């Protein structure tokens, strides 16, 4: 959290707006379990000391005159990791945080950021390092009308030596997880959860520790793709590009650092395209396109339920 940029939004507040009509039925007052609503000068008034923010008055008001205001970052956080510091600014409890990035994309003031590696990546390219981009299959939803061949050409113009799709790693991950499943379920564990999403696996292990052993030990598609490429390019530096900030957490792990050197989000990649004034409409297809080496199920990892469908 960038403290000086935080707007100190109210954590949770139920408030009567100017739309209150002062109706005679007083439904908001009738449904309040704490008798926190009174009427002053013909308008509804909420005693914040008594209000428990249950929202019953919000849903009952026929004029939608009562609103429930919540801090956007805290509302988006699914694990309750956002709290307030002594000055009322947002603060992250890293014992609960799973680095999913939901607070980051929901803060209207841009006060929550993740650690970027654009500078380090550009310096590596300028030094002449062989930098290979491995791109998540979700790129088709991030860049309209972008074909794999056009993406390879665009990445080449940024200075990348080559570009591969992480879907091939998803295929390898499916094989490993299927092997784990056949070996361990139900003989050792009642079920098995996928390991492909670091935010999910961290959340499961933090909040459901008794089921931690039920998470597959298979490497993620990102790591498996990086390992595959380094077999033929041992000196190459690997840059993962995807939609999720949680991959930055994964890449910081000691066991992954030797495999993946940089992580960019699609937003950061788009910033690089704009800085280099790369127009997708004007791009020719890369004639050496060998991007499509994965299965349809591997690309389906980017769809909700895709991992399970690939393993089924």
Regions found by a protein language model. Give the residues of each.
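Immediate flanking context of iron-sulfur cluster ligation sites
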Residues: 11-15, 95-97, 233-241
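Gly-rich Lys/Arg/Thr-decorated short loops/hinges at beta-loop-alpha junctions or inter-strand turns
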Residues: 7-15, 38-43, 84, 102, ...
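Ferredoxin-type iron-sulfur electron-transfer modules and their immediate structural context
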Residues: 1-60, 64-76
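Iron-sulfur-associated redox domains of electron-transfer enzymes in respiratory
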Residues: 1, 114-312
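Surface-exposed charge patches
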Residues: 30, 75, 105, 153-157, ...
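Transmembrane alpha-helical segments of multi-pass membrane transport proteins and ion-pumping complexes
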Residues: 22, 26-31, 60, 106, ...
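Glycine-rich, histidine-containing beta strand-loop boundary motifs that form or position
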Residues: 32, 41-43, 65, 70, ...
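Conserved Radical SAM active-site core
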Residues: 47-48, 53, 63, 72-132, ...
């Amino acid at each position: 959290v960038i403290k000086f940029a935080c707007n100190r939004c109210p954590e949770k507040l139920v408030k009567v707006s100017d739309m209150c009509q002062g109706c005679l039925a007083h439904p908001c007052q009738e449904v309040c379990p704490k008798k926190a609503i009174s009427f002053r000068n013909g308008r509804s008034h909420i005693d914040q000391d008594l209000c428990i923010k249950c929202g019953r008055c919000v849903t009952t008001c026929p004029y939608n005159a009562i609103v429930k205001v919540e801090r956007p970052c805290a509302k988006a956080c699914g694990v309750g990791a956002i709290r307030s510091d002594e000055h009322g600014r947002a603060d992250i409890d890293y014992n609960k945080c799973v680095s999913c990035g939901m607070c980051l994309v929901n803060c209207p003031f841009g006060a929550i950021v993740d650690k970027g590696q654009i500078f380090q990546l550009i310096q590596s390219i300028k030094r002449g390092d062989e930098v290979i981009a491995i791109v998540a299959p979700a790129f088709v939803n991030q860049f309209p009308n972008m074909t794999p061949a056009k993406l390879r050409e665009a990445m080449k113009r940024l200075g990348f030596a080559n570009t591969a799709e992480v879907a091939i790693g998803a295929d390898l991950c499916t094989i490993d997880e299927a092997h784990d499943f056949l070996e361990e379920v139900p003989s050792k564990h009642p079920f098995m959860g996928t390991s492909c999403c670091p935010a999910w696996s961290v959340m499961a292990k933090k909040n459901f520790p008794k089921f931690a052993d039920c998470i597959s030990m298979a490497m993620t598609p990102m790591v498996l793709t990086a390992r595959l490429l380094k077999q033929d390019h041992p000196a190459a530096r690997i840059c993962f590009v995807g939609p999720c900030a949680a991959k930055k957490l994964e890449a910081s792990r000691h066991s992954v650092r030797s495999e993946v050197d940089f992580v960019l989000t699609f937003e950061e990649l788009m910033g690089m395209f704009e800085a280099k004034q790369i127009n997708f409409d004007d791009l020719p297809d890369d004639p050496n396109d060998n991007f499509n080496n994965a299965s349809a199920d591997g690309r389906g990892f980017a769809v909700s339920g895709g991992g399970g469908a690939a393993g089924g």
